[in-house]
Amino acid sequence: MVRAVLFDFDGVLADSERLHYEALVHALKEMGLNLSWEEFKQGCIGVPEWDAVQWALKRNGVNDNELVAEVLRRKTQIYDSWLTERLKVADKMADVIRALAQNFVLAIASGSFRHQIEAVLLREGVLELFPVIVSCKDYEQGKPDPTPFLLAMERLNEFISPPLKPHECLVVEDSPAGIQAARKAGMLCVAVRSYYDDEALKDADFIVDDLKGLLMPKLWEHFQMTPLL
């Protein structure tokens, strides 16, 4: 029985991957470097911020951790300056979250920075519905390693009784790396269509068109989930 829903953030709750890409390219161009959208999809979605920047630099033939830190600092600065005005959330995001919170405990396990996640959730009025937020500073091994999701479950278990088990957690993801992480954690997984085709999402238990698909009766029947009140 599903008792908890663990969300990725970028591409699931927020339509933010394009903004991340634009900010990264802006920072790279200041260094005389570049990255295509297809390259970004290949190596930068669903992974921690440091790993994404490191991958982008290696793609440009650069292997320098000091430069990774500098590009990440600049990319974060640019992204944060755009956050309030340009970042859009998934359609009906707040409504979906409030509906799910009636029956399940919720958490976020993301490769983004905590302040970026909290700023958006606060803006949308749902921050208090996520007792646990795991961000890129909370772990060393990011997705596709299962650590982010297992850590989110562990932190939920600090105030849930009986403790959650992996098979009682439903992960909502949009990237192959995130789906792999959920699988390795022994958790169920729903994939939201965003920037990848269904072939790339095939290892998920269920695929939905958008976040609103989490409220479909067909999905609830598939996972034998408790009906909404």
What do these predicted ranges mean?
Residues 81-108, 114, 118:
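Short, acidic loop-to-helix structural element flanking the phosphoryl-transfer center
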Residues 34, 105-106, 188:
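Residue-level detector of anion-binding/catalytic polar loops
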Residues 45-81:
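A metal-dependent, Asp-based hydrolase signature
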Residues 21, 25, 49-54, 114:
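An amphipathic alpha-helix signature
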Residues 29, 100-101, 183:
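Anion (oxyanion) recognition and catalysis
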Residues 33-41, 61-71, 128-129, 161-166:
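Short, surface-exposed acidic
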Residues 1-42, 202:
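Active-site neighborhood of HAD-like aspartate-dependent phosphohydrolases
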Residues 1-3, 94, 114, 118-229:
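Asp-based, Mg2+/Mn2+-dependent phosphohydrolase catalytic module
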